[in-house]
Amino acid sequence: MYNAVGIDVSKGKSTVAVLRPGGTVIRKTFDVSHTSQNLNELADYLSSLDGTTKIVMECTGRYHEPMVKALSEAGLFISIVNPHLIKNFGNNSLRKVKSDPADARKIARYTLDNWTELRQYSGMDNTRTQLKTLNSQFSFFMKQKVAAKANLIALLDNTYPGVNKLFDSPTREDGSEKWVDYAYSFWHADCVRKIGLKAFTERYMSFCKKHHYIFQQDRPEKLFNASKELVAVFPKEKTYKLLIQQSIQQLNLASEHVERFRREMNELASTLPEYSTVMGIYGVGKTYGPQLIAEIGDVSRFTHREALTAFAGVGPGVDESGQHKSKSNRASKVGSARHCFRS
């Protein structure tokens, strides 16, 4: 005996429909609030049903996660499916009905029709959910970092033009950059050229020692001579110093968050079985690899490469009818923009 449970998830509550083969209704469609008590009661009810029970719900952002957590911990079979599959399922009625109970029943019918192909939610899916959340936060702080850096450069162009191009040292593991550290100490061109070469050399040596940079004997003279040719629009005043140093602090904080998320994502992704395969792709590194895994999910559910292309939403559509046969079609736009591998 099969029990097909369709759950239409929304924010704070879900609508549940329970069907058996032949369209037999086990219980009238009902709503469940996303509270601990109500979710536990739902889990107890579904566990008490005679026969084999499978539960299907759509992947709707983060709204489905409380339901998934409660039912998976109860040992029930849960499958999370792409909403587009449900949308295109069973559209054989002239009457269009859009309501939570109707959607829940539609998901339950989908469960019955695809009973043997349903893929069960696993612990690995929880890891992938964590990875996707980290990737979202990584992207958020990366945007903040880019904005903070652009703002800082705009300010420095008025006090120490071109300071961001003085050094080509790579970004450190903590996200710090040499030119940013240098600009914090020497925020204005007058901080260099007005104190004389000898005094600047001593200050630059102290700067390198403090931040653990290699001191080069000829570097202070080059920096000193270059500063003489610069035109500073803003005067060397306390207000501009405060603005620049606060901007640097904001940039360093965003950079620290970015690097922390980058490390955490790589560590988490390395626990997944597909990690070595993805990292073996040419051009994929410790940043792009975990991002691919986060947005693609479990690659084992794709039986061929066209399935992955369709999931990403970048597959070319088919335009054929009668004698017409298009040879050049636009890529489809179905699915999340993140699945197009843009981060």
Can you name each region flagged by the protein language model?
Residues 1-343:
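A detector of single, family-specific signature residues
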